Amino acid sequence: MEIFDTHAHFGQAGAETAAVLARAAEAGVTRLVAVGGSEELNAAAIQAQDIRPDAVRLAIGADRDQALLPADEVMSEIRRLHASRRCAAVGEIGLDFHYTPETSSEQCSLFAAQLALADEIGLPVVIHTREADDATRGVLDEVPWHGDGLRGVIHCYTGAPAFARQLLDRGFMVSFSGIVTFRSAEEVRASARYVPDDRLLVETDSPYLAPVPMRGKKNEPAFVVHTVRFLAELRQSREDALAALTFANAVAMFG
């Protein structure tokens, strides 16, 4: 059984990253997306790809926490990294109004600029959205999209089935993290039942959000097996079948 973790972050310590990647391989996680979002996260994701170029796909971007930095400098650096590296996606990008609603305008501008970049260079996007459904939908609808097929993935989905349907209609896949295993996450489970097989992805969002039964531990890609097992039971599927379909979906998106 092969598993594709579509969203993992890494630290700066190369030895630790190598060990995390080795444990992932032992657990059957044969591919993953190392995701950036800041100068530090982008550098760490690049390092992960350098350590395991066969297994690691790379997403480079500027997340909502970079929204108050000089926009021209941020976008220039993102363009430079995409020109110099073999990237599979632009990300993570998007909106989070939970902690910093006061930067909503700047977040939307940075989000839109990177959507336009992804369209220009022909890559999918990895989107974060939290307490920003209307704004996310608005930016997605404002930015022209000239590519064919799927536009990207809404990662670590925590919304209702109704918003998931709107995202699916706009050409996105939907990815579920260990949150779906949490006792309080009934709405997330409803969405996980709703998303069709050909749009479903799985992730860790490590080092955060370790799934049950690993809660309280530092998350890592190897733990995605627990989320796969949980989703298979939730969707009344075999574990190996769910791993296979999410792997195929991820390969179609990221290679």
Describe the role of every protein-language-model region:
Residues 1-255:
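Mid-domain alpha/beta scaffold segments of enzyme catalytic cores
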